Amino acid sequence: MIKTAVATFLNRHLQPSSPLEPAHFTITNGCSSAVEHIAWAIANPGDAFLLGRPYYNTFVPDLVLRTGFNYYKRAFEKAAMGCQRVAGLIVSNPNNRLGRCYSRASLLNLMTFFSENDMYFISDEIYALSAWENEVDRGLEPAPFTSCLSLTSTDLTPDRIHTIWSMSKDFGANGLRIGAIISQSNPSLHKALVAVALYSSPSSASNHIAANILEDEKWSDMFIQTNRSRLADRYGLVARWANTHGITYTAGANAAFFLWADLGSAWKRHNSGTIKDEDLDDFLMKLFLEHKVYVSSGKEFGSESVGWFRIVFSQDESQLLTGLERVSLLH
């Protein structure tokens, strides 16, 4: 029931190059279990997975906590020189931190590279239906969302390409615990996961509720459109706040509910002191918490520069404004 509902729903929304069927799915209790299961199936202890920075920080325990894999190498060549096998790459598309989508060309290039080198490409598309129109950052043309399921090329090895999706973000349903591993050309993967997926199966109640939601096309379409509209509105609110306060942020977001902002530089511009760069994130994090506002530090996500923080803007407008005001007071 749940596999059929998810397949039918995603066929409508992700435009796969070939129709999704129930046999193409392994259902899990969320994307974390899905990531861990795929890693277990395609890699061996000591193997490495590549992650782009900044990355979704929970990928790290998902990949390594129980498997013994290495989660990050700065470059493929570095791993190769160390005689270490790279099992594959995992990407968040849309990106979980920057709120941007990979372009069609970028996805094809990545998928082709990993196919040619006998490695796996894993696309986490948990924000697939949370793309919206950016009407604030003028002059930029963000790439629209493209699912890797919609791409095809003679250069690709389909059995090495896996997709992950969940209702947790697009439907604001973290507690429902419904996730999916999608692999159209690798039945051996699904067969291998039968035993381990036994420990991460959603409840019958979750399956029933999720199927009812996904099968109600009129309601689900309305919900998705309303969500997109509200996310676009909230992004505009936060982006204008950042511009008003001279806070640099990564412009061009058009998906999910994040604004990647350089709060560190803004703080240093208005505060003289002796805070070392390596201590800046922890210092600001402590300061924010003292003023009862939580903003995730880029340090947690492998940020390549200090002082960057992730602002989540999917709250009620009054709560969001209160949080932004508290951040503003610290600058």
Feature map (PLM): residue ranges:
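PLP-dependent class I/II
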Residues: 1, 5-331
